[in-house]
């Protein structure tokens, strides 16, 4: 798989997400500052709730912008079957007969993108799965423990 094209697909999706988030933040800001948002009594919290929402939206916008900068300057490395998994590796794993694709990047964990007919999810090296994959190779098993649950991911391919 061409990881440079994958990064471009992620950036395109994030730019679209950013546009939607900015529009939503503007609408929330307008709602928070609108005259109708002034409290009618001591129990009326519409304006306060709108201001909390605006703050959360501003944080999300900042996170997307930060990830876009990281992706713009990302040094995408090429990995082969004998290479150890590290940052910018695209990894195909099998868990319970299902194949999944993970792209390891320092930020943006949980972002999903459709690419070449597959769903690719960003995983950070500090996430449980990201930590389990670090320094493994094709054919190895990544073990992720979550409470009393143990998941084993077989590494099928690395790009």
Language-model segments: residues:
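Non-DNA-binding regulatory cores of transcription-related proteins
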Residues: 81-144
């Amino acid at each position: 798989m061409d990881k440079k094209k994958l990064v471009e697909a992620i950036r395109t999706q994030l730019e679209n997400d950013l546009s939607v988030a900015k529009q939503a933040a503007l609408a929330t800001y307008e709602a928070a500052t609108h005259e109708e948002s002034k409290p009618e009594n001591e129990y009326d919290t519409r304006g306060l709730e709108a201001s909390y929402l605006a703050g959360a939206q501003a944080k999300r916008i900042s996170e997307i912008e930060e990830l876009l900068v990281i992706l713009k300057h990302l040094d995408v490395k090429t990995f082969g079957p004998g290479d150890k998994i590290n940052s910018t590796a695209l990894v195909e794993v099998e868990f319970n007969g299902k194949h999944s694709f993970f792209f390891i990047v320092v930020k943006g964990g949980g972002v999903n993108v459709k690419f070449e007919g597959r769903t690719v999810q960003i995983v950070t090296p500090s996430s449980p799965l990201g930590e389990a994959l670090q320094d493994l190779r094709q054919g190895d098993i990544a073990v992720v423990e979550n409470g009393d649950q143990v998941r084993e991911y077989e590494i099928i391919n690395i790009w």
